[in-house]
């Protein structure tokens, strides 16, 4: 079991999500639409300055895990990629062309390690509140909490281990978003919602 690199140095990572063009989700069953995607960072002030912690063998925090990009940009790019991959257009501000407005409040984007006797457990959590509003019926909103998690066992824990754990949790978050029946229902035309 090795935690490679100096545990006293911050780890800089670049988490991301890439949509698989050969794999679509239930979002593809919807009529193509223009979606305004708004991302807000609701994390605590302690968690806003980093996206995780490196822990030593005693469980104490030895360094921070820092993202090379703002968390709001990571979420915007991930959800945009998934919506685009399923035939929808994403814009950053509501307009007359907008069918739905999706507001995402990021509550958690976090990774850390736990040293065990024979291995290192890498954990990550991605959690956000999703609100979908219909332009034609602004009073009609859907609010849902979506979470993605990852727990991976490793023998070595370098910077890439933290990034891989967050990428796995982010992928799970996007999959949950794209397959959630309440979210799909909120995207449907009000006349056809069931």
What are these language model-derived features?
Residues 56-70, 136-183:
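Short secondary-structure boundary motifs at beta->alpha junctions and helix caps
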Residues 73-85:
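Amphipathic alpha-helical segments
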């Amino acid at each position: 079991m090795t935690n490679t690199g100096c545990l006293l140095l911050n780890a800089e990572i670049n988490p991301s999500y890439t949509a698989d063009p050969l794999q679509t989700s239930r979002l593809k069953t919807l009529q193509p639409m223009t979606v305004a995607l708004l991302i807000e960072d609701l994390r605590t002030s302690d968690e806003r300055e980093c996206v995780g912690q490196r822990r030593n063998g005693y469980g104490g925090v030895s360094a921070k895990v820092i993202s090379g990009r703002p968390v709001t940009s990571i979420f915007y790019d991930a959800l945009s990629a998934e919506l685009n991959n399923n035939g929808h257009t994403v814009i950053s501000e509501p307009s007359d062309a907008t069918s739905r407005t999706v507001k995402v409040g990021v509550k958690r984007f976090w990774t850390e390690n736990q040293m065990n006797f024979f291995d290192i457990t890498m954990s990550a959590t991605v959690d956000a509140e999703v609100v979908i509003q219909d332009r034609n019926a602004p009073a009609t909103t859907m609010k849902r909490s979506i979470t993605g998690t990852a727990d991976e066992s490793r023998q070595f824990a370098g910077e890439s281990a933290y990034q891989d754990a967050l990428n796995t949790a982010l992928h799970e978050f996007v999959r949950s978003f794209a397959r959630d029946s309440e979210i799909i229902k909120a995207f449907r035309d009000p006349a056809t919602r069931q």
